[in-house]
């Protein structure tokens, strides 16, 4: 912590390869709205010293602790803030373009995705200043919001059963985490609030 902010990569720059890591909650979260602001710093370390600055907000984190655990990722990466990554067997239903790389669209066919990256809608991030991220978790649905704009929605979130990995089960809760992936980043004003029964949890302009 530094001046009330979470400061990731507060270490000297080095030519030696550094391990990735994360900061995880102890409790599980469900049916809530999570807000946090982030801003990039200047430091980068090997192996990401020449790549886009990268971090992430992971949610519905279930299973053993490891890098890239069973979870979904609200991508925090230069030019890609709001992308969704499906990690370690997680799968969703969402609206995507039917040609080329999977890309979320506001109106389109529903399709089940079970691996890799889904590109966010639009580009609303500030490369040089503070950005506000909102993650809305509503039962087995999730919404990514960047600076007040909806960029990703997911329905029917599922993960493999612990007893039988070939069987998928609905997921509506899990831990959250912030990633450290070789780039300096500050997070501030982290808030987590329950969704009220009368609230429209997916509302944003």
Identify the function of each model-found stretch.
Residues 1-205:
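Carbohydrate-interacting regions of secretory-pathway proteins
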């Amino acid at each position: 912590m530094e001046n009330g902010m979470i400061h990731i990569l507060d270490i000297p720059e080095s030519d030696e390869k550094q391990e990735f890591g994360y900061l995880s909650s102890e409790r599980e979260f469900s049916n809530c709205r999570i807000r946090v602001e982030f801003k990039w710093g200047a430091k980068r370390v090997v192996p990401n010293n020449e790549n886009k600055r990268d971090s992430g907000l992971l949610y519905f984190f279930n299973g053993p602790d490891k890098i890239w655990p069973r979870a979904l990722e609200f991508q925090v990466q230069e030019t890609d803030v709001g992308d969704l990554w499906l990690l370690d067997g997680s799968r969703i239903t969402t609206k995507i373009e039917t040609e080329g790389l999977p890309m979320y669209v506001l109106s389109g066919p529903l399709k089940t995705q079970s691996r890799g990256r889904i590109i966010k809608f639009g580009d609303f991030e500030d490369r040089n200043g503070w950005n506000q991220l909102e993650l809305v978790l509503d039962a087995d649905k999730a919404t990514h919001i960047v600076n007040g704009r909806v960029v990703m929605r997911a329905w029917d979130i599922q993960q493999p059963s612990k007893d039988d990995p070939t069987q998928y089960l609905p997921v509506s809760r899990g831990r959250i985490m912030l990633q450290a992936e070789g780039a300096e980043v500050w997070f501030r004003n982290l808030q987590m609030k329950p969704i009220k029964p009368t609230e429209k949890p997916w509302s944003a302009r």
